[in-house]
Amino acid sequence: MSDVALVVGAALVGAVVVGPVLNHAITWWLGWRVVLPLLLGRVPAAGELGRSRTRCAQCGAGLAPAGLPARPAVALAGRCPRCHTRLPAWLAAVELVTAALFGLAAAVIGPAVALVPVLALVAGGVAMSAVDLAVMRIPTRFAYVTAGLVTLGLVLATAVDGPARRLWGAVVGAAVLGGLMLVLHLISPRMLGFGDVRLATVVGLAAGWFGWRSDLPVIGPVQAVLNAGLVAALVGAVAGLVLLVARGRDRPFPFGPAIAVAGLLVVLANA
C-alpha cells in the first residue's frame, strides 16, 4: 500500500472522530445562541445546555457514548438508537462532507506536515459553513479556534519543511484577503458580515502560505488570495443566481461557504 493511500486512510479515520465533534460544536452553538434563548426567553445556564445537547429531542436518549462528545450520525443510520426518531439530515451531511474533504486533502497533499493546517481549515470551514447556512452567522469562537489551529499547523509545517520566510506569505495572505473583505463589509455590511471577514482572514493564512514562492515572496501569496477571492465571488454569484431563481426575488444569502470552498480549492491547487 502506498504512503498516499495510508495517509488518506488515516485522514478518513480522523474524520470519523472529527465529524461528530463538529456536529457537537455546531449543535452547542445553535442551541446556546439561537434556539434555547427563543424557547426560554433568556440565555440558558451551561448545565441546562450540557444535559440536552447530546440527547434525542424526542425521547431524551443519549446520543454519545460515555466520555465522548458525540456518536457518528452515519453510524446511527440517522436515527435515535432508542426511539428511532429520524435525526436532522444535516448531522450526517456534516460528517460525510468532512470525510470527503479530509480524504481529498490527504490525496492531494500526501504524507506531509502541511496536511495538518489544511485539515484544520477543512474542519473549521465545515463548522462555520454549517452554521452560516442555518442562521447566516459565523461564530466568532469557531473562527478564532480555526485560526489558532491553522496557524499552529503552518508553524509546524514551516519548522519541518521550511523556509521560515514562508510564514510571511501567511501574514501577507491574511492581511490582503482579510483587508479586502473588510472593505467590502464596510461598503455593504448587509451582504457581507464581519464573520465573513474573519473566515476570509483564516483562509488567507493558509492560501498565502501555500502560495508563497522563493522567487515570488510577496506576489505569490497575493496572487493566491486574490484567486481565492475571485473563486469565492464566482461561487457566491452562482449560489445567488440559483436562490434568485428559486425564491423569485433578491435576498441576502450566506457567503461563508463560498469563502471556505474557494480557500480550500486554492490551497489544494498550490499544494
What residue ranges belong to the model's regions?
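Short, conserved phosphate/pyrophosphate- and ester-handling motifs at nucleotide-, phospho-/glycolipid
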Residues: 19, 196, 254
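Membrane-interface loop-to-helix entry segments
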Residues: 90-94, 138-144, 251-256
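Interfacial loop-to-transmembrane junctions
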Residues: 240-266
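Functional transmembrane core segments of multi-pass inner-membrane proteins
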Residues: 115-120, 124-235, 240
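Cytoplasmic membrane-interface segments at the C-terminal ends of transmembrane helices
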Residues: 23, 27-35, 71, 130-139, ...
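N-terminal transmembrane signal-anchor/hairpin module of polytopic inner-membrane proteins
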Residues: 1-110
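Juxtamembrane boundary at the C-terminal end of a transmembrane helix
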Residues: 268-271
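Alpha-helical transmembrane segments in multi-pass membrane proteins
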Residues: 11, 15, 19, 98, ...
